[in-house]
Amino acid sequence: MNTTVTPEKKLNTNLRNKRMNHPTAGQRCMLWVDGVGGFLTCFSARVEIGQAISETQVDVPLLGDLSRHHAVLERQDDVYLIEPHGPTWVESRQIDKPRVLADGDEIRLGDSVSLRFRQPHPLSSTARIDFLSTHRTQPSADGVLLMAGSCILGASDNCHVVCRHWQHEVMLVRQRQALACHVNTEFEVDGSVNRGRAPVTMSSTIQGDDFCLSLEHID
């Protein structure tokens, strides 16, 4: 068996590892938070929602009676717009053209998929999608994060992920094509002890005295 590593194979491996370790437009990961849940995290400014079927690739695949490409959420600076491609309602009004979303808006897709749009932190453009109906994503998640520059986890209601028992806030920050974690205390990233700030990858585990979260790359 020929096990020679050619330059082409090495390049392909390096590119695959880079995609797995650094967030780029169109990439996604699962953010698992111990004691809280799992959140499908999208890094693109334009996110497509549709039915979860193998023949269609969308950013947020939902198990429900939807069109394959049902709607698009797009971030423009600090504002999010929803663009309907299938029957879509915002605050009980059907829309047929892009509409700006406000924090707390209820979105209905099709006959029964109900979501709530949240933009809880006044200093962050990151948004969260909560499920009001029983429908879930594939892979299953407790919510969807549309990550802009930062994602804040902590005990306050204005955090993107609310973790009531945490003493310190944890902030994930995008820096060009990399991710970093900021915590105002000592914490570990993949077993290495840090304080204040540390780089993380799309497969890192971050742990402190009273918190633990991990990232899982999604192809």
Stretch-by-stretch model annotation:
Residues 35-37, 110-112, 208-212:
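Glycine-centered tight beta-turn/hairpin loop motif at sheet-sheet or coil-to-beta transitions
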Residues 27, 107, 125-133, 180-183, ...:
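Short, hydrophobic/proline-enriched secondary-structure or compact coil segments at domain edges
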Residues 32-35, 131-139:
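Short, solvent-exposed loop/edge segments of extracellular or virion-exposed proteins
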Residues 116-135, 214-219:
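Short, compositionally biased
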Residues 102-123:
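Short, structured interface segments
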Residues 41-104, 141-210:
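Forkhead-associated
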Residues 20-36, 57-64, 110, 121-125:
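N-terminal short leaders/motifs
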Residues 1-48:
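Hydrophobic, helix-prone linear segments
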